[in-house]
Amino acid sequence: MRPFQLLSALAIFINLEAVEAAAYWDCDGTEIPERNVRAAVVLAFNYRKESFHGYPATFIIGSTFSGVGEVRQFPVEDSDANWQGGAVKYYILTNKRGSYLEVFSSVGSGNKCTFVEG
């Protein structure tokens, strides 16, 4: 391969990497970026219980979730910003490790959101 061909191949590879779609949660057609959800997981356990506009809320775990540990609820936004109070359109339920993680919509019928890999 000649040097100019190698440079072209590298440029194409870099552009393909940039175009790769990121993972997200589909909430009735609204996309919640995975990075927002992961940030909300961290925030849910960085704040003391109910210390930030009444969040994070903590739930008692029954035998259904054995091994999951404490589960917290925390709002998540569909934009690039973290939730700063006000109406809650979307929220997560998670444990500290993030091994149990669900996203829900409180808009409309309040459905569970679906994870879509990027």
UniProtKB/Swiss-Prot annotation:
Principal location class: secreted
GO cellular component: extracellular region; host cell
Location(s) in or outside the cell: Secreted; Host cell
SS bond list: 27-113
Top-level taxon in the UniProt lineage: Eukaryota
Signal peptide span: 1-21
Keywords, alphabetical: Disulfide bond, Secreted, Signal, Virulence
Stretches assigned to coiled coil: none
Role, per record: Secreted effector that increases susceptibility to infection in both monocotyledonous and dicotyledonous plants. Non-catalytic homolog of fungal RNases that binds host RNA and inhibits the degradation of host ribosomal RNA induced by ribosome-inactivating proteins (RIPs), preventing host cell death, an inviable interaction and demise of the fungus.
Subunit structure, as described in the record: Interacts in planta with the pathogenesis-related protein PR10.
Protein name per UniProt: Secreted effector CSEP0064
Organism annotation: Blumeria graminis f. sp. hordei (strain DH14)
